[in-house]
Amino acid sequence: MHTTTKRRKAMDWLNFDPIPEVDRLFRFTCKHPTLHVHMTGSYGHMFVDISDLPASARHYLALMAASRHRCLSLMDHHRRKFLEKGGQQMWLLGIDWSYMKFRKLDYLNRMLCHRPWMIHWKNLAVLFARRTPDGGPAFFSVCSLHHAVGIMSMTHAMCTVICCIGLERRVDLTQDEIDFLNIDDLDYWEARMSAYFRKVPDRRPTEVEYLISELKKTEKGQTRPPAKMCAMTTETIESLISAPAATYSSNRKNYSPVLLLANIDENGEDIMEKEPPCNYPIYSHHRTFGYIDFRKRPEKDIPPFRVEEFGWDHVYNTMNEYTDTLTSRLDRMFDHIRTLTGNMPSGSSHASGDGEPPAAVNQNEIDTAAFREAIWNYTQGLYGVRVDDYDYSKINRVLDKGTKTFIKLAACYPHKLTTEFTRALPGFKDSEKIHVVMMVAMARFQASMFHYTRAVCNYNAMCLSKKGWRKPLD
């Protein structure tokens, strides 16, 4: 009887209204025609390309990925597409209603979105197919897993774009949606469910709260004190919810498949008991799990990712064998977005145009290569990707503190941005602002693919090492 009541209540989520914001997204990218072609081609190709993944499963994966950043617009869009492609309605009740392989993939979804440097080859070993060509209900084929990771990483990046340019739905919200958006806000839950949470007196602001307050000061033109950002340490995470967040072994010794069953953390504890009682459908477990500054990571045995040792060419060659068309599209998109603009007005200190030389070159125009390179390398540095031959001191000379704050929020906490923060880049034109946002989104996308593909190579090497052929990279 209890199960029937729960199922009837959850079925209300099937009666949603499609939100048109996603269709409006590519109208903004039209300000850069060539980029628009690459974006629409790459994003659309992920859902129509020939692959082992059924069409409905692709949209369900995107729904799982969008839920990590609580992007309601994308979630509504992929719910509708999932049903249009013949997906099972019961799956929309939550990830626990889907196949086992999607529940196991949820762990990888969390890592790709928030801490990709933690992806290990043993996380992939329990996902690959054993006997059936398509992987069956419990495993993925190599091709389908590559495709699934591409969809999830691209969706994470699209959440950044949608939230930054103000297309995220923040009106006509139900109470459950409001609870979902504030799942990690201790003050909100203290006021709403005081009986379930203890009050934390005089707690220090979390890193997200600090970044948002700094961004507000930038918009108001206030002078910011030279305060040091508080790191998202374990103590800070504990201030978000009543119980401490799940910990992850710095020795990386425990990679049991049970960790991939979503509702159990590495310590064998029930994640659901640590989260607020939110009734919104769960498409990805451990919803309070989030980004931690790479420099403050507890996993000190994980070194920075060196591009000189494993660059985009390695990623391309590894995945091109299985997803050649998709990989080629991504290669062209990454190459184009990094060279999108050639010049910018010196008065505004940012880029303009679509890579085409202006009719009359102004003597005050300067090259934007340093600006674009600083944005790209700073964003990827947030996810542990380092370029040895780049002078990172240039970032502080090229990007002011307000711009770096906006980039960090956009890349790591896009769900914390609202429409009022779209004015965080004063003096930027719409096309220029979109260019910056797209660079941030694609830089984090590529960083996720770096870490994932290196784990794939380590997995392949370990399989061969059993025959004495080679050793893993790590």
UniProtKB/Swiss-Prot annotation:
It comes from the Eukaryota. InterPro entries: AhpD-like, Sestrin. Keywords: Cytoplasm, Nucleus. This is Sestrin homolog. GO terms for biological process: cellular response to L-leucine; cellular response to leucine starvation; negative regulation of TORC1 signaling; positive regulation of macroautophagy; regulation of response to reactive oxygen species. One of its GO terms (molecular function) is oxidoreductase activity, acting on peroxide as acceptor. It comes from Caenorhabditis elegans. PANTHER family: P53 REGULATED PA26 NUCLEAR PROTEIN SESTRIN (PTHR12474), SESTRIN HOMOLOG (PTHR12474:SF0). It is found in: Nucleus; Cytoplasm. Disruption phenotype: RNAi-mediated knockdown results in decreased lifespan. GO terms for cellular component: cytoplasm; nucleus.
